[in-house]
């Protein structure tokens, strides 16, 4: 796994531990995922805030988390001084609830709003959770207004998330929205072959 180069306990404690295998190099590109891949790759090539937020959506197993992980890896390697956090929406909610219970919401707000890049996986998780949505909305606005980068993934486009507040949907859809198209047979076989080759490399002889 890849460790964060920025020694900030807050970031270390909430960020998903990056998987070095989920890199751009190991992502199998085809016609169905070319747009999400290109947008994600561009995000790391000195193109921060060229579109903000970047919102990637598609069905389960299409490679959304792989791309977010790959973005985080590239940013930490190319821009180690950026305060980058990659976390699930569930984890964001958990941190927010914990801050409320410990009467420490000011610290929570300050920590999240001091980030340079916030990467959130599965934003649909906060659907129907009004207080978490409201806090995320304010965090989102604050970061965008500062010119910081936000990258989001979901199983649906922002406008198809029924349990999400309308103003949050509007903000999520205000940047670049890219989706995964259904995979064809050729891409599925290429992905399978890639995984088989990785397994072979992992088996000691």
Predicted regions and their residues:
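Conserved C-terminal "switch" segment of AAA+ ATPases
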Residues: 182-205
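Structural recognition of the conserved hydrophobic beta-strand(s) that form the central parallel beta-sheet
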Residues: 86-87, 119-121, 149-155
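Conserved catalytic/switch belt of AAA+ P-loop NTPases
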Residues: 128, 133-156, 166-171
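Conserved AAA+ ATPase "SRH/arginine-finger" region at the nucleotide-binding site
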Residues: 160-162, 175-187
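Short glycine-rich substrate-engagement loop in P-loop NTPases that contacts/grips substrate
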Residues: 76, 81-117, 127-130
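Short regulatory helix/loop adjacent to the ATP-binding pocket of P-loop NTPases
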Residues: 97-101, 156-174
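Walker A/P-loop nucleotide-binding motif
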Residues: 48-69
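Pre-Walker A (pre-P-loop) alpha-helix and adjacent loop at the N terminus of AAA/AAA+ ATPase modules
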Residues: 14-54, 73
